[in-house]
Amino acid sequence: MSKGQLEHTNITVSDPERSAALFKRLCGWHERWRGPSQMGGWTVHVGDGQAYLALYTDGSGPLHHAKGAPLNHVGLVVDDLDGAERVVI
């Protein structure tokens, strides 16, 4: 079986700046990147040298999510892509 590690998690937030400030204070992380997102809107990445949170907003204003809905995706890095593919397919 392949070995993997969490690389990033992308979540939708109402205010990436405020969320980034919170996680930097709470976890001692730093800002890794910021800019326009691929889907429109804005993203700020905060984390350490190993993993990060991508804090995304589409700019549409206040967001109200059902439980679990703000999670967009989780990025994993694996040492054996073919082996990991066999596990999930």
Across the structure, where does each feature detected by a protein language model lie?
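Core segments of cupin and vicinal oxygen chelate
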Residues: 3, 11-53, 83-84
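Vicinal oxygen chelate
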Residues: 5-15, 44-45, 63-89
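Short beta-turn/strand-loop junction motif enriched in small, turn-promoting residues
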Residues: 29, 60-61
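Short, conserved turn/kink motifs that form compact alpha/beta structural patches or helix kinks used as
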Residues: 52, 59-60
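Short, conserved beta-strand segments within well-ordered enzyme catalytic domains
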Residues: 54-56, 75
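N-terminal low-hydrophobic presequence detector
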Residues: 57-58, 89
